[in-house]
Amino acid sequence: MKLLLASGLASLVLMSPAMAENMLRVSYPEDPKTADVQMTTDAYTLPLNVFDRLIESETTGPGQSALVPGLAEKWEVSADGLTYTFHLRDGVKFHDGAVLTADDVVYTFDRMLNPATKALNTDILTFIAGAQDRLDGKADSVSGLKAVDEHTVQITLTQPYAAFLALLASPGASIYNRAFTEAAGDQFGLTPETTNGTGPFILRDYTLNDSQMLEANDDYWRGRPKLDRLLIRVVTDSETLRMLFESDELDVFDLDYAPTQTPYFYGSDQWKAQVRSGPRVGMYYYNINQAKKPFDDVRVRKAFQMSIDRQTILDKNFYGKGKLEDGVMPRGLACYAAATPIEYNPTKAKELLAEAGYPDGVEITLQQASNWSQRWSDMNQIIQAQVAEAGFKANIVTSDEAAFMAARKVGDSDNYTQVWSADFNDPDNFFYTFFSESGTKVRAYNNNDPEVFAAIDKARGMTDQEARCKLYQDLTSRIVDTDAAWVPLFSLDHSYVVQSRVKNFTVPWNGWSDMSYYKVEVE
């Protein structure tokens, strides 16, 4: 990693607003460590600004997106849903001046699947024919990847997968230049000198655990960004973050990194008009393990659903900034439709427990890992008190995370609460993850419903999107209402506060903190 003197960017950081006229200053609590998206699963700001993808997921409104052409100006899908043909834009250049070719695309995806790379997000490509053999070291290339000519890429899948285009719009599918990346070797993405993309910004400086400086790409194929520079600072402390923002040394304040500041900014006469908010396409939920008594009885599961006052948790723990969710798909996800509301009714829940053979109540375990943040413990304590009214005598058990994950992997953990955010905009990201035959076990739901398994597998290959959405909506009712397989809690809003000179700042469709700053302007 190239380490610059701390003073190297200090003068830029402390610039007056006038001097920093065309520079946007943002912050994140951790250093990304690399710009190589194949080597990270949770730091996407550099990849989203330095690289492009064949297809992009463009925000069209709060919690809304559309798949639009990226490096591929158009594409076709064969009638059987197996072959995707992408036609690349002519004349797209990498930051070093090299012209994008089909070979770069094939190389990028092959590099991800090459076991020597040890990439962390190979799952987005495993539907490609030959991908698993490449990952397993049984092949030297991927049979389903082909450069037809200089501007045409053909990708063949092992089976139809309706979400494949959405996967290609995820950050992990960023495209690299073969010659540059091979020359950089294992240093690729670690320094400005070893980073090269086609994106709207060029990585110019990188001070480990301090900051990254990006400059506008004058030759960007979509047109030069409005910003001249993008300064990304690493700020670990929430009080320091607020001080920097209110002293005009940062242009954007991400309330996800300082949630206790939410009442202040929403109530401040100075700042409340500068709040920008959008839904996070994700869901807090409570797991129910049907392999363990008393939750093998659907009446007990329904009672548990009805005994949790979700609105109170949202209000107490998250200042009410969100929306109750009642299904499997959170708002903003493709195919989303409002599900049947889950009633909060501890009296009826108590009756259901009695019907199930527990007239005097029943003991249950709520599990959490020792290194999880305080919010999970806070939520469990609230839920422990709430469900007691219905007759659930909940014991909160804290275990080592490794032990918890090992037990969950074989379907043996106790009930727990967690959150899942959309990696890509397709229902499969939720349904397959939690309720497929493999997913329901490794996440310890054990909702062994063959009708659900068959429907999820069918939906993955459907090409009629309207019919596919209808199937997912019917599945929601089956999973949440009929099987009572989990407790959907709520989705949150993601709020930012921006300086008044910041224009065209839009919360990404998925509500992530990581975003492209291509369209943002400063006055």
What do these predicted ranges mean?
Residues 189-192, 217-264, 384, 393:
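Ligand-site clamp/hinge motif
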